[in-house]
UniProtKB/Swiss-Prot annotation:
The keyword Amino-acid biosynthesis does not apply. Gene3D superfamilies: 3.30.980.40, P-loop containing nucleotide triphosphate hydrolases, Winged helix-like DNA-binding domain superfamily/Winged helix DNA-binding domain. Residues 43-53, 332-344 have a biased composition (Acidic residues). The gene is ftsK. This is DNA translocase FtsK. The chain crosses the membrane at residues 69-89, 105-125, 137-157, 182-202, 205-225. PANTHER family: DNA TRANSLOCASE FTSK, SPORULATION PROTEIN RELATED. Residues 271-290 have a biased composition (Pro residues). Residues 28-55, 246-391 are annotated as: Disordered. Keywords: ATP-binding, Cell cycle, Cell division, Cell membrane, Chromosome partition, DNA-binding, Membrane, Nucleotide-binding, Transmembrane, Transmembrane helix. It is a multi-pass membrane protein. It comes from Corynebacterium glutamicum (strain ATCC 13032 / DSM 20300 / JCM 1318 / BCRC 11384 / CCUG 27702 / LMG 3730 / NBRC 12168 / NCIMB 10025 / NRRL B-2784 / 534). ATP binds at G553, S554, G555, K556, S557, A558. The keyword Acyltransferase does not apply. SUPFAM superfamilies: P-loop containing nucleoside triphosphate hydrolases, Winged helix' DNA-binding domain.
Length: 921
């Protein structure tokens, strides 16, 4: 009985699923009346069709044989006990065993053989509880047995002699029942034992009292007890149940029953996932974009029904999300039910998430045998303009982050399959053939590969395993076998073998993971899932710059999409700004017009070089402000700005504002390096060397990681690497400084080395569809229009005047020489020869050029020349040598300049006394 109660929840859901599948099969087999409206309904797989694979223990062939041996031993013991207890033909040994059993459990000896037979059958059929539930089941069974023996002892009159106890509850029943009777009396001891018995049954079956009451109420026909079934019915009826009732009423000629519309009830916690995924929130209709967001939060209703991710429980989102739940309508005419055009065109996000409900709705319409009549709805009233009280002046309060519920959840991960057992046997056979003392002690199944842990015997070298890599690959019938010697943190060798049934990792699961949601870092991006089955996310601030490489089709573009979608769902435009460089012109097109952009998406390499140069100037300006305010990081600068600790000096026209983080994503670095290699490399090196504290980060992606694209200077200054499948070992060494990427199997399989990590981490990159990207982008664009910054892509070289003729082609060398001389404050020709690796003649010419421009003094024989330019004036002199106007050079605001500006302003204006209470400052 307890086992049947334990199967209650699962059987009920299986019955509903079977009925649903039978309904879809019946609909799919009927001929369609019109091609435009009748579609074949694809049956959805049951959510627990791979239940055995997911919950199966990772058992080897040895463990299975051991279980069979235990089962046969139990059968033998049951035969001996049955012969001795039931028939009295057990002989002396059997009689002795029967006496001991009677002495221990009394009358329970009569049913003990049956229990042993049942246990043996369960072991033979592998019908055992999950590993995490074994302790709970054993505790429940133990409590039931002890309580039953104590009850038998009490009902037998609490015998004091051992002969009487043999036919009652035995020693166990006496030890439990006698103290209860002496302490409480038999009238209280029996209810206490019955309650304990009931509690043991609940522990064994794993159900709650509420579920038991619902089962009992449904079994005896009481109304109002089957809440789970009502919830399923209400979920379907609320959206499409009235369509079903309308069709049935038209077919039978009865009047349709009117049911008041009501909101979906809040679902109680279940042990099984819902039959159909809940509808995902879709963005509200986009208002006319404006530079100042004027939409109130009340215009975006919040949907409290969160999608339940199969891979991991959902955690409440840290920001509200916008959603509108629409319900199809049926006209009250003699015609067949009308469907509006708006209903026939679902939102992009809900198309993918609520596919089962859409297919069921189409099946219901097709079953009617009539074409749906399109009903024209009256135009919706114009939205009421928000009042000034509804508009919050702070931009952070008027922007609502797109919810991660817009993304499609993935399927539950598999923990074990028959393929894993075959791989263990194949690897073990290879060790046996070559006489290697090593055994497979376990494995970790990831979404793409499975890592088998190999434990070596005493005196076995690790090289014996590595030398068998080709033989292992032959045994498992794949060439992409990767050895890990040793596994980090374990005294074992890892053999990574690709899975024949790969798992798709969805970005929605990564962003909805508990660790990701609890992390409040706005620049945290979802990477994917590692080989242990854990979701991997990492902050761009900690990278702080990332180099991504991989061949065509390896998953590089999918990672770029995951990065951008992660930033859109976690960061507001005031927090993170983006510069997107897309030389291919098609990869980043969906993100055109998002409010996070500093400039429109850049597709021309020349403009990309100008944008990188603009980033260098922005970095220098930020550092000057940080120096002026005595802070070392952009976080501290923004914190002091918001708290009011940093104030503009009196008389200064400068207004300090919080700086947003800037992420520059270059989709294809090779195209830029072919057009302007020197300028691109110089800008990248300068940014990656010192832009981390200024809040500027680079993400460089390329499908050709050769030495002419990823140069030594770029590699040195970009600490984090993400390598997808490469075509050769050379490319893997260029991106990772080691091999391994050439062994990856593509389609998102990657090796990730964050800053400071010694060995790469193998992950399966997250995937996001075009529909999901569009849903997130639409919601962001609906709330705010991008505010572009002028001059980001303007070519500064075209505006500069002509370089002096005497400099010629030596401008770059002259700039390096000037920077070296000014910073070291030593004008020595021999130093230029050593530092710049040039000859004496060129070094002397550079020194003469610096003398004519007032950088150094005249020659003094063998002594070093006097340096006339101070280090504070370096930026200005470099600006002048490039042919630009000195007034355009970046300058730091000194107190002398502020005093001069204050004096000039005081001469032309009237001084007003500051009075904060009156708003005058």
């Amino acid at each position: 009985m307890t086992r049947s109660i334990g199967e209650l929840g699962r059987r009920r859901n299986e019955d509903v699923l079977d009925d649903f599948d039978d309904f879809e099969e019946e609909i799919a087999t009927k001929p369609a009346t019109r091609k435009s409206r009748s579609k074949a309904v694809e049956p959805e797989p049951e959510f627990d069709e791979d239940f055995d694979e997911q919950s199966g223990n990772r058992t080897s062939a040895y463990v299975e044989e051991h279980a069979d041996g235990i089962a046969l031993s139990l059968v033998g013991i049951a035969i001996v006990l049955g012969a001795a207890v039931w028939l009295g033909i057990g002989g002396p040994i059997g009689t002795f065993i029967a006496d001991i059993v009677h002495l221990a459990i009394g009358a329970g000896a009569w049913i003990l053989p049956v229990g042993l037979i049942g246990w043996a059958v369960a072991l033979m059929l592998r019908y055992t509880p999950e590993r995490q539930a074994q302790g709970r089941v054993m505790l429940g069974i133990g409590v039931i047995i002890v309580c039953m023996l104590a009850l038998i002892h009490l009902f037998a009159g609490n015998p004091a002699e051992w002969e009487g106890r043999k036919t009652a509850g035995g020693a166990i029943g006496a030890w439990i029942g006698t103290p209860l009777e002496l302490g409480f009396s038999v009238f209280l001891a029996v209810p206490i034992l019955l309650l304990l018995l009931f509690w043991g049954a609940l522990k064994t079956t794993g159900i709650s009292i509420r579920e038991f009451i619902e089962f009992a109420g449904g079994f005896f026909g009481f109304a109002g007890f089957n809440r789970d079934e009502d919830e399923f019915d209400e979920e379907d009826d609320d959206l499409y149940g009235h369509v079903e009732r309308e069709l049935e009423s038209r077919a039978s000629g009865r009047a349709p029953s009117r049911t008041p519309s009501r909101a979906l009830p809040k679902a109680a916690p279940r042990r099984t996932p819902p039959l159909t995924p809940p509808p995902a929130p879709v963005p509200a209709p986009a208002p006319t974009p404006a530079r100042r967001p004027a939409a109130s939060l009340d215009k975006y209703p919040v949907d409290d029904a969160k999608a339940e991710a199969p891979a991991e429980p959902q955690v409440k989102q840290r920001e509200a999300s916008t959603s509108i739940l629409k319900k199809p309508s049926v006209t009250e005419t003699d015609e067949f039910p009308a469907v509006t055009e708006e209903d026939l065109a679902p939102a992009p996000a809900s198309d993918a998430v609520a596919a089962s409900r859409e297919s069921m709705r189409q099946a219901i319409i097709a079953r009617s045998g009539k074409d749906p009549v399109v009903e024209k709805k009256p135009a919706a009233p114009a939205p009421v303009a928000p009042t000034p009280a509804d508009i919050v002046s702070d931009g952070d309060s008027t922007y609502v982050l797109p919810s991660a519920d817009l993304l499609i959840p993935g399927e539950p991960a598999k923990l074990h399959s028959e393929t894993n057992d075959r791989m263990i046997e194949a690897i073990t056979d290879v060790f046996s053939e070559f006489n290697v003392d090593a055994t497979v002690t376990g494995f970790s199944r990831g979404p793409t590969v499975t890592r088998y842990e190999i434990e070596l015997g005493p005196g076995v070298k690790v090289s014996k395993i590595t030398n068998l890599q080709s033989n292992i690959a032959y045994a498992v019938a794949t060439e992409n076998v990767r050895l890990l010697t040793p596994i980090p943190g374990k005294s074992a060798v890892g053999i990574e073998v690709p899975n024949s049934d790969r798992e798709m990792v969805r970005l929605g699961d990564v962003l909805n993971a508990r660790a990701t949601v609890e992390n409040k870092d706005s620049m945290l991006i979802g990477l994917g899932k590692d080989i242990e089955g854990d979701f991997v996310s990492y902050s761009v601030q900690k990278m702080p710059h990332l180099l991504v490489a991989g061949s065509t089709g390896s998953g590089k573009s999918a990672f770029v999409n995951s990065l951008l979608v992660s930033l859109l769902t976690r960061a507001k435009p005031e927090e993170v700004r983006l510069i997107l460089v897309d030389p291919k012109m098609v990869e980043l097109t969906p993100y055109e017009g998002i409010p996070h952009l500093i400039t429109p998406i850049i597709t021309q390499p020349k403009k990309a070089a100008a944008a990188l140069q603009w980033l260098v100037e922005e970095m220098e300006q930020r550092y000057m402000d940080m120096k002026q305010t005595r802070v070392r990081h952009i976080k501290d600068f923004n914190r002091k700005i918001k708290s009011g600790e940093i104030e503009t000096p009196p008389g200064s026209k400068r207004e300090y504002r919080a700086y947003p983080y800037i992420v520059c994503v270059v989709d294809e670095l090779a195209d830029l390096m072919m057009t302007a290699p020197k300028e691109i490399e110089e800008s990248i090196v300068r940014i990656t060397q010192k832009a981390r504290a200024a809040g500027i980060h680079l993400v460089l992606a390329t499908q050709r990681p050769s030495v002419d694209v990823v140069t030594g200077l770029i590699k040195t200054n970009v600490p984090s690497r993400l390598a997808f499948a490469t075509s050769s070992l050379t490319d893997s060494r260029v991106i990772l400084d080691q091999g391994g990427a050439e062994k990856l199997i593509g389609m998102g399989d990657a090796l990730f080395i964050p800053q400071g990590a010694g060995k790469p981490q193998r992950i399966q990159g997250a995937f996001v569809t075009d529909e999901e990207i569009q849903a997130v982008v639409d919601m962001a664009k609906a709330q705010r229009q991008p505010e572009y910054t002028d001059g980001v892509t303007e070519d500064k070289a075209s505006e500069a005047k002509k370089i002096d003729a005497d400099i010629g082609n030596d401008l770059e060398d002259l700039l390096e020489a000037v920077e070296l001389v000014v910073t070291s404050q030593m004008g020595s020709t021999s130093m230029l020869q050593r530092k710049l690796r040039i000859g004496f003649a060129k070094a002397g010419r550079l020194m003469d050029l610096m003398e004519t421009r007032g950088v150094v003094g005249p020659s003094e024989g063998s002594k070093a020349r006097e340096v006339l330019v101070k280090p504070e004036e370096l930026e200005t002199i470099l600006w002048m040598l490039k042919g630009a106007d000195p007034a355009d050079a970046p300058k730091e605001e000194t107190w002398d300049d502020e005093v001069a500006a204050e004096a000039e302003e005081a001469a032309n204006t009237t001084v007003v006394q500051a009075d904060p209470s009156k708003g005058v400052c």
